[in-house]
């Protein structure tokens, strides 16, 4: 297995439990893990939607790890996922203050994951060029 496929699968296995923690049983897991009380069905719906996005990304990353033609797209989606989640956490720290340590750990992993995924994209796929759309 090459390093790109390994990192895609490694990330999927790391993110999947977080997805389940957010959405499988939010009224049980969120108070226990994150000190977040679910006070309405709307809040459960939001966390289950987040779970759905995380699971969908996980599926795509595993497919990309197994299918060369989708690997670069899967790496880009991994980079966007880590960068977007990390940027949101940084924004929250700036606007809301420091969260519990588990979210600082998540931020550290997102920064690391973003850097590794971008490195894999640039090192492994710099030989590829965009097709010429117009010929003169």
Per-segment meaning from a language model:
Residues 59-74:
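Juxtamembrane helix-break-helix junctions at the cytosolic face
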């Amino acid at each position: 297995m090459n390093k790109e496929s390994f990192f895609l699968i490694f990330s999927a296995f790391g993110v999947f439990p977080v997805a389940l923690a957010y959405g499988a049983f939010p009224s049980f897991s969120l108070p226990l893990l994150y000190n977040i009380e679910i006070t309405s069905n709307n809040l459960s719906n939001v966390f289950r939607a987040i779970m759905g996005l995380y699971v969908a990304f996980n599926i795509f990353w595993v497919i990309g790890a197994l299918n060369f033609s989708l690997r670069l797209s899967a790496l880009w989606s991994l980079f966007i996922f880590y960068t977007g989640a990390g940027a949101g956490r940084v924004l929250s720290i700036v606007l809301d203050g420091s969260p519990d340590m588990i979210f600082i750990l998540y931020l550290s992993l997102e920064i690391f994951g973003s850097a590794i995924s971008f490195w894999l994209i640039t090192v492994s796929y710099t030989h590829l060029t965009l097709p010429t759309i117009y010929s003169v």
